[in-house]
């Protein structure tokens, strides 16, 4: 039996990580076989790559290098953690996946969505999520939350301009328009508890529909 692969996308400061943690805890409490993980990271090799990608000192990183590093981390994470969990029949909740690369490097960095998609096609080897939950929030609100959250892990992408984050949002909107059947869009400007309850309901409804 194969499990369900659910990914979470959105701009910086959208609140994905907090909601994923709460959803994971509640699903475990209810007896679901569920695993939560993140990209880049989730396993030792990918966490090491994450440190290189997001280190604030690495300001000279080329956009293509960045895209390739994300794809490398993604491949190892899939092979070592995600795919084995899916084969065990678990539901996998993943904080970011290939759509992040398409929106950030493909669109906002200007490498081209098709170019970055081709890199990632090799990395993911056909593994795609059955559902992607997109946390919709304006770049202004997202950056405001980042600066207000002193406990949040700061990274190199937080240092980007408002224009860059606006391009990221445009990139996501383009991806959603291309695959509307896969995406569920959540208004992440709402109170966190409301967002959490909506996300939990959508996931549970989807699992029931797929008899998982």
UniProtKB/Swiss-Prot annotation:
Keywords for this protein: ATP-binding, Kinase, Nucleotide biosynthesis, Nucleotide-binding, Transferase
Residues annotated as transmembrane: none
MF terms (GO), sorted A to Z: ATP binding; dTMP kinase activity
CC terms in the record's Gene Ontology section: cytosol
SUPFAM superfamilies: P-loop containing nucleoside triphosphate hydrolases
EC number annotated for this UniProt entry: 2.7.4.9
Top-level EC class as recorded in UniProt: transferase
Matches recorded under Pfam families: Thymidylate_kin
CDD domains on file: TMPK
Residues reported in the UniProt entry to bind ATP: 10-17
Family: Belongs to the thymidylate kinase family.
Classification via PANTHER family: THYMIDYLATE KINASE (PTHR10344), UMP-CMP KINASE 2, MITOCHONDRIAL (PTHR10344:SF4)
Role played: Phosphorylation of dTMP to form dTDP in both de novo and salvage pathways of dTTP synthesis.
Identification of the protein by name: Thymidylate kinase
Species of origin: Bacillus pumilus (strain SAFR-032)
């Amino acid at each position: 039996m194969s499990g369900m692969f659910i990914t979470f996308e959105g701009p910086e400061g959208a609140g994905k990580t907090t909601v994923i943690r709460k959803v994971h805890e509640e699903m475990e409490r209810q007896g679901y076989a569920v695993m939560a993980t993140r990209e880049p990271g989730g396993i030792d090799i990918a966490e090491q790559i994450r440190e290189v990608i997001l280190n604030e000192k690495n300001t000279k990183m080329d956009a293509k290098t960045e895209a390739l590093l994300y794809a490398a981390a993604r491949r190892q994470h899939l092979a070592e953690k995600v795919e084995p969990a899916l084969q065990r029949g678990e539901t996998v909740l993943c904080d970011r996946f290939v759509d992040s690369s398409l929106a950030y490097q493909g669109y906002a960095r200007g490498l081209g969505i098709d170019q970055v998609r081709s890199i990632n096609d090799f990395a993911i080897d056909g593994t795609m999520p059955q559902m992607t939950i997109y946390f919709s929030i304006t770049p202004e609100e997202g950056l405001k939350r980042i600066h207000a959250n002193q406990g949040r892990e700061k990274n190199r992408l937080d240092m980007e301009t408002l224009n860059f984050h606006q391009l990221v949002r445009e990139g996501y909107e383009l991806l959603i328009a291309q695959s509307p059947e896969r995406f569920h869009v959540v208004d992440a400007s709402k109170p966190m508890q409301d967002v959490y309850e909506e996300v939990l309901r959508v996931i549970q409804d989807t699992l029931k529909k797929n008899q998982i």
